[in-house]
């Protein structure tokens, strides 16, 4: 489903595509530092999103396994951003594993509260999910580093 985002030589090979994407983010961390940019935006990925709806029932531990894998993939990237003194803002977005405050908190927990984990806030995504976009600011203001308005 995500092949269209990668160059042709990485399509139809999820392992190679994932490695390419990881390398692109590592380059982005370095480029951000070179440009004097202190915050960078990204999406989290969607390992568990397709299983969000509770029917049919998902296997026990699926969400735990997905967030464990998500953090395994992101920790080296977060560490690279940290070594370049750049925060990484995850856009809270339907279709992504980080799609609300609770999933952001879960990711934060699985990354051991990594200091570079921040949030891009776009209230339109909250409206689509019928979430209270104003209280989100009160609760997560310390993590909001970028905003789409």
Regions flagged by a language model, labelled:
Residues 1:
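Short, structured active-site "lid" loops
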Residues 5-119:
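Active-site acidic/histidine proton-transfer and metal-coordination neighborhood
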Residues 23, 72, 128-135:
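Short, conserved clusters of charged catalytic residues that mark active-site
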Residues 29, 134-137:
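Short hydrophobic/charged patches on amphipathic alpha-helices used for structural packing
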Residues 95-101, 124-133:
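Active-site glycine- and acidic-residue-rich loops that bind
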Residues 114, 143-144:
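Core-facing hydrophobic residues within beta-strands of well-ordered domains
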Residues 138-142:
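Short, conserved loop/helix-junction motifs that constitute active-site signature segments
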Residues 148-149:
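Conserved small/polar residues in nucleotide/adenosyl-binding loops
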């Amino acid at each position: 489903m995500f092949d269209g985002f990668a160059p042709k030589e990485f399509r139809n090979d999820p392992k190679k595509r994932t490695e390419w994407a990881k390398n692109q983010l590592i380059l982005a961390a370095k480029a951000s530092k070179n440009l004097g940019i202190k915050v960078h935006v990204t999406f989290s990925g969607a390992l568990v999103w397709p299983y969000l709806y509770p029917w049919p029932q998902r296997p026990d531990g699926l969400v735990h396994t997905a967030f464990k894998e998500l953090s395994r993939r992101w920790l080296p990237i977060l560490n690279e951003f940290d070594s370049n003194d750049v925060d990484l803002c995850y856009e809270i977005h339907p279709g992504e594993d980080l799609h609300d405050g609770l999933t952001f908190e879960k990711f934060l927990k699985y990354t051991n509260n990594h200091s570079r984990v921040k949030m891009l806030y776009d209230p339109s995504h909250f409206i689509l999910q019928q979430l209270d976009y104003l209280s989100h600011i009160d609760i997560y203001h310390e993590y909001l580093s970028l905003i789409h308005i």
